[in-house]
Design a protein with these regions (language model features):
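Nudix hydrolase/Nudix homology domain
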Residues: 1-64, 75-76, 119-124, 169, ...
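Short beta-strand micro-motifs in enzyme catalytic cores
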Residues: 6, 18, 81-83, 98-100, ...
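Conserved hydrophobic/aromatic beta-strand scaffold that supports enzyme active sites
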Residues: 9, 66, 84, 101-103, ...
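Short acidic-glycine loop/turn motifs at beta-strand connectors
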Residues: 12-15, 106-108, 182
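Cys/His-rich short segments
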Residues: 53-105
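N-terminal strand-loop-strand
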Residues: 83-125, 130-131, 159
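The catalytic Nudix box helix
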Residues: 126-161, 176, 184
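Active-site-adjacent beta-strand/loop module that shapes the phosphate/pyrophosphate-binding cleft
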Residues: 164-186
Length: 240
């Protein structure tokens, strides 16, 4: 049975209230656990939004149980949208961490894709990173691409394409396309294992052969690559 310390009000749509319940390890329910990455592309926009909100709120509650001022356990308030300290009466709210993700292309219309050091051999995606304190999103694009692969970006070429909440743990991904002013790359050894410049023909042939696997269609990276590609990507090219 859900109580006010385990139920989260996700929102109201057409007079229907949507509620998420945080389960503990001792629950009698035997759920089938799947990740948002696994099912996101199959859900409706409403269900995706609800799932993202539930994941973001539940993660925040699990990692911010104590008051940062006095250390006491805080209580869930505002139907799950805040936590309040019983001693200080201070209310704490979920925080969102901005991050950029960018499809870098060159003057030959090739796209720059990278494989992170902890990914399988054929997994490739666009470059991404967190926006630092006091930094604009545009400056973060230039810095992250320079730090991760040693490529310089033409700042005036930046084009904002859209955003996606990504609750792992609390990111808001801000998607861009950008023109590289240099093409020679040097991957950051602690983050990037491999980098490739790919034409549209090379991308399709390597994806068809299995040499390359792209992000899940539920991820904004898929849509950034698709924007550069100029037509719908083959769903079979995804890593699943």
């Amino acid at each position: 049975m859900a109580d006010e310390q385990s139920a989260l009000l996700l929102g109201i749509d057409s007079d229907h209230a949507y509620i998420a319940v945080m389960l503990d390890e001792n629950t009698d329910v035997a759920p089938l656990w799947v990740t948002l990455r696994d099912v996101g592309a199959q859900l409706s926009p409403l269900d995706v939004g609800l799932a993202i909100t539930a994941t973001a709120l539940a993660t925040w509650h699990n990692t911010h149980r104590y008051c940062p001022q006095c250390g006491l356990t805080t209580q869930i308030s505002d139907a799950g949208w805040s936590r309040t300290c019983p001693k200080d009466c201070v209310t704490h709210f979920p925080r969102t961490e901005p991050a950029i993700i960018v499809a870098v292309h060159d003057s030959e219309e090739r796209i720059l894709l990278g494989r992170r050091t902890n990914w399988p051999e054929n997994w490739y995606s666009t470059l991404a990173g967190f926006v630092e304190a006091g930094e604009s999103c545009e400056a973060a694009v230039v810095r992250e691409v320079r730090e991760e692969v040693g490529v310089e970006i033409d700042l005036e070429s930046l084009q904002y394409l859209g955003s996606q909440p990504w609750p792992y743990p609390a990111s808001l991904m801000l998607g861009y396309s950008a023109l590289a002013s240099t093409t020679e790359f040097k991957p950051s050894e602690d983050e990037i294992a491999q980098i490739r410049w790919l034409s549209r023909e090379e991308l399709s042939s390597q994806c068809e052969s299995g040499i390359l696997k792209l992000p899940n269609p539920a991820a904004i990276s898929w849509h950034l690559i698709e924007h550069w590609y100029g037509q719908p990507l083959n769903p079979e090219w995804t890593r699943g």
